[in-house]
Amino acid sequence: MSSSSKPFLRALAGETLTPPPFWLMRQAGRYLPEYRATRAEAGSFLDLCYNSDLACEVTLQPLRRYGFDAAILFSDILVVPDALRQHVAFKEGEGPVLTPIRSAEDLSGLDLSGLHDHLAPVYETVKKLSAAIPKTTALIGFAGAPWTVATYMIEGSGSKDFAKAKGMMFGQPELFARLMALLVQATGDYLIRQIDNGAEAIQIFDTWAGALPEDMFERWVIGTTRTLVERIRTERPGVPVIGFPRGAGYLYKRYVAETKVSGVSLDPSVPLHWAAAELQPKCTVQGNLDPLLLVAGGEALDAGIDRVLKALSKGPFIFNLGHGITPPTPPDNVARLAERVKGWKG
């Protein structure tokens, strides 16, 4: 039982609340006209991530509109490789482009020593948000999980099949293990520093967890996440961690049991009845409305919201999407969702 006045933190501590707390992944984003204006003011996407005043502003924008129970730091999972001195850029219409890590020589060019100096503007954003958000709103810090971040670092961009990343994992296992060890260290350092600046909970995004076979999932998704959870629990006791092993399917059950996360975020493919029976007795569940229902709106949206609420609100639960809000989402549909979740009587 949590003594917190913040519903989001109470739910993560195991309380069942009616209505459940809610926030949405990518709640600060291109679907909001005020975000697009601030983004234009910033210049590049990374400039926005590293401008603490503007990053704070875009984090607060959806709170003003919708009254979410949590704010999530506005940043990107690729600030970690950027801070490790890998070249990272975001190209309009293309997404992230990185100078790929393919060899021991490439790996030797990465440097942990400047991590905190490089990420100082992000920590400043966290500090400003901690002071700016409403008293009942929780502040979530986050990072990409080592496997997911490694896919971008090795591929040099997004990928459909992760051929280069898996090629290193299977064909150069020692090199891959060295990269993952560096990412576990850097990610842990980064998250601890976010907590020290005011983050009250952490979410670890493993967007490409579902791409791995079970033995590699066990080592590189469960194993690395467990290390991060244990470190946070030891060094900053009381700060809950939410894991998001997107696409993990049946392996969600092992992930929850073996990482010991406080909460788990469910993608839209996870059956609700199964999540309620198999996952919710062990940790708080978060999710899992399909983001495209939020684009569609109308009765389909209402029915989708109700289906999730009916299935999961009998135990510790945080309402969310199964992945991030997409740019075509009408802001009025988000208002409709907020009103419906806030009005839920069980």
UniProtKB/Swiss-Prot annotation:
BP terms from Gene Ontology: protoporphyrinogen IX biosynthetic process from glutamate
Family: Belongs to the uroporphyrinogen decarboxylase family.
Compartment(s): Cytoplasm
Positions bearing the site annotation: Transition state stabilizer: 76
Any GO molecular function: uroporphyrinogen decarboxylase activity
Entry protein name: Uroporphyrinogen decarboxylase
Kinase listed as a keyword: no
Lineage, broadest ranks: Bacteria, Pseudomonadati, Pseudomonadota, Alphaproteobacteria, Rhodospirillales
Catalytic activity: uroporphyrinogen III + 4 H(+) = coproporphyrinogen III + 4 CO2
InterPro entries (alphabetical): UROD/MetE-like_sf (IPR038071), Uroporphyrinogen_deCO2ase_HemE (IPR006361), Uroporphyrinogen_deCOase (IPR000257)
